[in-house]
Design a protein with these regions (language model features):
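Nucleotide-activated donor-binding/catalytic signature segment of Leloir-type glycosyltransferases, i.e.
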Residues: 75-82, 87-114
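Short acidic active-site motifs
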Residues: 32, 86-89, 111-112, 159, ...
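Donor nucleotide-sugar binding/catalytic pocket of nucleotide-sugar-dependent glycosyltransferases
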Residues: 1-31, 42-43, 104
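Nucleotide-sugar-dependent
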Residues: 58, 109-118, 123-144, 149-162
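A short, well-ordered alpha-helix in the C-terminal region of glycosyltransferases
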Residues: 45, 180-183, 187, 194-208
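Conserved donor-binding loops in enzymes that form glycosidic bonds
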Residues: 19, 50-55, 83, 106-107, ...
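Conserved donor-binding/catalytic core segment of Leloir-type glycosyltransferases
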Residues: 21, 42-58, 64-67, 79, ...
């Protein structure tokens, strides 16, 4: 973001505040010891999670198409957690398509959040292109703190792309490239070494 602001102002007037995460509350939790996993029957599932605002500034619609294209991947489960203006339409689309591989849950209490985020095998972050050039969703840092690989649904000219490129803890894919998103999920599910690398790098990034 500083680089962008330098186009419009003087360096000595710009103060960078370091990235944050509630690291004391958010830590990796193995699935066998995670009550959220047990409560929602996520054992033996590869969990693709979006958790947060399901509103106008978050490009989550493509996840319905991704879930549709992965209906035969019986070990993949999509979780969409949160509330927002788009949620009703997304639930209706999923029901119309009879998608059994996607579950919508309400916003979780803060004391549940460390467990819900840690249940993910892949964390989705996304922002509308109008704001993503200079912003990163705050959930990004909590996902990294629990050691989750990331999928940023965004273009390359974004803070999310720069963050993932720096720490090598996931991929950044445009919302229009549904096939690429599907391929990435399948690759991460099957390649244990790649997944572990991204997990480790997310943890390292959260402590940087």
């Amino acid at each position: 973001m500083k680089e962008i602001l330098l186009e419009y102002g003087e360096a000595e007037k710009i103060k960078v505040v370091p990235l944050w995460s509630a690291s004391d509350d958010f830590k990796p939790i193995c699935k066998e010891q995670n009550p959220f996993v047990k409560e929602h029957h996520l054992e033996n599932k590869f969990v693709v999670m979006y958790s947060g605002n399901i509103g106008y500034t978050h490009s989550v619609e493509c996840l319905i198409e991704v879930a549709k294209n992965m209906q035969t991947d019986n070990d993949v489960k999509f979780l969409m957690i949160g509330e927002g203006k788009k949620k009703t339409d997304l639930v209706a689309q999923a029901e119309e398509l009879n998608l059994r591989n996607i579950t919508f849950l309400p916003l979780q209490d803060f004391n549940v959040l460390p467990y819900s985020l840690a249940s993910a095998d892949l964390g989705i972050i996304t922002l509308d292109e109008n704001v993503s050039r200079v912003s990163v969703p705050s959930k990004t840092f909590n996902l990294m703190a629990v050691g989750v690989p990331l999928l940023a649904i965004s273009n390359n000219d974004t803070e999310m792309f720069r963050l993932i490129s720096k720490y090598q803890n996931g991929r950044c894919i445009s919302k229009s490239n549904v096939d690429d998103i599907v391929a990435y999920i399948r690759e991460l599910k099957s390649d244990k070494m790649l997944k572990q690398k991204y997990c480790n790098n997310s943890l390292l990034a959260s402590k940087d």
